[in-house]
C-alpha cells in the first residue's frame, strides 16, 4: 500500500511488536517471543543490501529456526528489477513508467530469494493490503477521521482551501 511509502509497514511492525509484550508464550513448547518477533522490516525509503541481509537472516534462521519479515510493497524494487532484467526477463511498466508491482510480486520474490539463501523449507507470504483496505477502523482511526472532517468543514466555512492532514513537524492537524 504505497509504492514508495513504507510508513504503513513500519507503523504496523511497531504496533505488532508492542502487542507481543502482552502475549503469553510457552518457550518449553518452542513458542517463544523470539520466534514471533520481527527479524527485518523492509521499506522503500531504505536501500536493502540483499547479500548482507541474506547472511544476517541466515544467522537468525540458524539461531531460532524461523525468520519473520515485514515488507512494504515497494521495498527492494531496484534489486528485483535489476536481477530480472539481467536474466533477460522483461519488466512490465504502467503508462507512467512505474514497474507493475503486481507483475513482479515483491513478496514472492523476497520469499523465493531468501528461502534459498537461508535454507528454508517452508515459506508463508501474507499480503496485508487486502486486510488493511477492508479492515474496520479502530478508535484511533475514527478519532482522526472525525478531527479531519471537523477541520475540513471549519476551513471551508472560513473560505480556506487546502488539504487537511497532520503536520509531521508539529504533530498537529492543519489545513
Identify the meaning behind each predicted range.
Residues 83-175:
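C-terminal non-catalytic interaction/assembly regions of soluble proteins
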Residues 1-121:
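Accessory alpha-helical/coil subdomains and C-terminal extensions
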